[in-house]
Design a protein with these regions (language model features):
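Acidic-aromatic/histidine active-site loop/patch
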Residues: 1-132, 181, 187, 191-197, ...
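Walker A/P-loop phosphate-binding motif and the immediately C-terminal alpha-helix
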Residues: 127-169, 173-176, 233, 240-241
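Phosphate-binding loop that captures ATP/GTP phosphates
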Residues: 155-216, 341
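Phosphate-binding/switch loop-helix module in NTP-utilizing enzymes
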Residues: 216-263, 271
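Inter-motif core of Ras-like GTPase G domains
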Residues: 242, 259-288
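Conserved C-terminal guanine-recognition region of P-loop GTPase G domains, centered on the G4
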Residues: 271, 294-306
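Beta-strand-loop-alpha "switch" segments that mediate conformational coupling across diverse proteins
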Residues: 316-322, 332-361
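NTP-binding/hydrolysis catalytic cores, primarily Walker-type P-loop NTPases
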Residues: 356-384
Length: 384
């Protein structure tokens, strides 16, 4: 293994300063001082590190986290007094003998250190050139992520599909599909891309298989981590995703260029990049007056920045509004002409079942939302 970097996750313990001094004196590179377990696992997934020096007090450290480290070929060394062999930790350094850390790092790792050497169970990379469908909506657009996951799950029944959570504000795809581990696929892939190391095998390690035809790249664990997705990362992620199959992107709500002189990208860059790479866009809005007002402004804005087809989805359509579909169509086309308009009915019971079970509406089944969205699939994925 060529990587020799060290990750440090000391959880604020006092021994961290001594450890840093020892490593600096030995000229052993510390790639990153990780703030939490999520940060550690995402950094390990980049393939740049060989060792992780951990505090026994690191929140969330368990057998699953240890397996993920070893799968990434990162050997964990715990500083502390607890016996953590039960979760797979075999290398320890007592706090009062922190000077032994270098010796433990230099010690040869046993052959059993990689517990899960098999390739990740995800869709294979092929010579395909899938289409990118970006699901977008203004602030407060109801059910944008639900529409995105449903479109992806419907498409996955017939064609390999990758669902990307690129929302820089409120990523929710992982939780809605029952992926509850703390590893961010987006952060792991972005760091690899930043280092020029994101290729087909490493991108496969960043994704999760949801069902036989659907992979997901989970989003940001917290909205303040958006700065770690640097310029060029999203286009590379989309390029590799196309090689797996069709791509559905759950994007953010704003296309405003919010960069400034202090940084190369703004928070909205993931959404801007996704729209720039899109083959078609699904614009989601609500059927009530506020939702329609926001939708029409977004539609006008999209028409100014991209020539690709924009398919409007009016979500949560219901009779209690007192409006006919033709009334809504006339209102929208007064401002800009979308490619198509699809009306999706309100189905609180079906959505509740989906969210509580951590499954897509396709898996839960029997929702009128599916029937409403199925005709849209042909329009966005097979327009010819």
């Amino acid at each position: 293994m060529g990587a020799d970097g060290i990750l440090l996750a000391a959880a604020g313990q006092a021994w961290e300063t001594n450890a840093l001094e020892l490593l600096a004196a030995a000229q052993r590179p510390v790639l990153k001082r990780c703030v939490d377990l999520t940060d550690l696992l995402a950094s390990a997934a980049t393939g740049q590190a060989a060792i992780a020096v951990l505090s026994e007090k690191l929140m969330g450290l368990d057998a699953d986290a240890v397996i993920r480290l070893k799968r990434a070929e990162v050997r964990p060394i715990v500083v502390g007094e607890q016996d953590l062999t039960g979760i797979g930790i075999t290398d320890f350094v007592p706090v009062d003998r922190i000077d032994e850390l270098l010796g433990q790092i230099e010690a040869s790792a046993p052959n059993t250190s990689v517990l899960d050497p098999e390739p990740p169970d995800v869709l294979p990379q092929t010579n395909a050139s899938g289409r990118v469908v970006v699901v977008h909506g203004a602030n407060g657009a109801p059910g944008r992520s639900l529409i995105g996951t449903t479109i992806a799950a419907l498409r996955a029944r017939d064609s390999p599909t990758v669902l990307l959570d690129l929302d820089p504000q409120a990523g929710s795809v992982a939780q809605s599909l029952g992926v509850l581990d703390e590893v961010s696929g987006l952060l792991a892939a972005a760091r690899l891309a930043n280092n020029g190391a994101l290729d087909s095998p490493s991108f496969a390690r960043c994704r999760r298989r949801i069902n036989p035809g659907l992979d997901v790249l989970t989003g940001l664990p917290r909205s303040d981590r958006w700065m770690e997705v640097r310029a060029g990362a999203v286009p590379r992620i989309l390029e590799l995703s196309r090689e797996v199959g069709d791509v559905v992107v759950d994007a953010g709500s704003s296309l405003e260029d919010d960069t400034d002189v202090s940084r190369s990208v703004g928070r909205n860059q993931t959404t801007i990049d996704a729209v720039a790479e899109a083959d078609s866009i699904v614009l989601v809005g609500g059927a009530e007056p506020v939702g329609l007002s926001r939708l029409t402004r977004s539609l006008v804005g999209l028409r100014e920045v991209t020539p690709v087809p924009v398919h409007v989805v009016i979500n949560r359509m219901r009779d209690s509004l007192g409006w006919k579909r033709s009334d809504i169509q006339d209102l929208i086309t007064t401002y800009a002409e979308p490619t198509t308009i699809t009306f999706v009915p309100l189905d609180l019971a079906g959505v509740d079942r989906s969210m509580v079970q951590g499954k897509s509406l396709v898996e839960v089944g029997n929702s009128p939302i599916l029937k409403a969205l199925e005709p849209l699939l042909t329009l966005v994925f097979d327009p010819s």
